[in-house]
Amino acid sequence: MKYSNALIIILLSVIVCCNSGKKNPDQHTPNIILIIGDDHGYPYFGFMGSEHVHTPNMDTLANSGVLFTNGYVPDNHCRPTLQSLVTGMLPIDYKNKLNSIRAEKRNTLEYLSLDTESKTNWEKEFDYHGLRYFETMPGQLQKKGYKSFQTGKWWEYHYKYGGFTDGMTQGWVREKRNGMNWFQQFMGGEGTQIGRISNQPVYDFIIKNKQDPFFIWYAPQLPHYPFDSPQKYRDIYKDKGYSRSAVEYYANCSWFDNVLGEFIQFLKVRDLFDNTLFIYVNDNGWEQEPDQEFINDPMRSHNGGDKGKLSIYDVSFRTPIIFSWKDHIKSGIRRTDLVHSTDIPATILDIIGLDKEIDHFGNSIKDMILGKGNGNRTRIIGNSNKIRDDKDPMGRDVEAYWIREQNWFFNWNITDNKQSLYDIENDPYCNNDEIINNPEIALRLKDAITKWRKEKIRS
């Protein structure tokens, strides 16, 4: 009997030791994958009602969790939106803080000791190096033991600036910044190969770090230009009577959908899917209806229709936002609450038990996701400093604002002294300006923007 008891104790010790090395899934430390569509207009998903675009994997993801159909990003092009996702700050607040940091750095001995040419280069490149002075969501996740990986679009020079522990974007050499493919380097360098070339870098990271909770910034340059999808995706839209530019854009949408499906299947095969929180958001909008032809239009072939990217219409800012986590978030839920993309980092931090930073604009929507509450946001206001220009695909500088409240969308281009009002419940593509018929509504929304502007603008 004495020997039997001793044997039991030894066996129990072995079991405890073996189990102690395993990190069991914990409801507070899920793996997190933030999926960011690049120039993916909200109408061009099956789950958003499109009869033209084939997106079966995104449809499955949307139906597996909570879909917010009235999500909004803060700006009409990618970089400000991506900055807001990683910091939780509005672009206008990010810019204000960056300018304050810039002013402080100009008074340091390090800056003052530079020669004139070096100071000029410092000024030109400070914006690309500025994020390293900010608190970021990946940096905060490290406090909970997360390993994080940046892949895809990333304008902020190096993945380390975002607080990631690993990544694909590793900066550029100043002397080569005006050479071949310089724009591709600015957008993320090798990071932009994810999905288009292979998902292998992110697979390798996950295999290496699967014993730790991980966060993935998954932002393929899709369906973004160039529209060079493999033929099998173009064949989906063959002989349907769509314009050539529609076929090319829709094919890129399906390409994005397929590489995401491959990523999800990779997680399922390795038993990592169940404890992974998936989040989806676009970086900005796009317009490409089946009968719109932009193939011979240099500006619109790169930026889509006039109501999408680099515009100040609803389509440019609106995005579906998805949260999916098996057995934790109820599936098949569609909500029409107004949700802001900066709510995403606040919600991620809340789910894993961390407080958001004081300068975060967004609020946690965890209770809404879990079905325990309703949204309290009655309006969303944003600004844009770029707008369409027939001479420059990057747009021209303006001061412009927009607001969504209930079924109304109002925009105000201060630079060009233009404003318009749309009933997007009945006119989602903003074709019929209602400002003459509803002047009191336009004035009220304009007053709300004016108040917001005074709070945000620094002289």
Model-derived regions, located:
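Formylglycine-dependent sulfatase
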Residues: 2-4, 11, 18-420, 428-454, ...
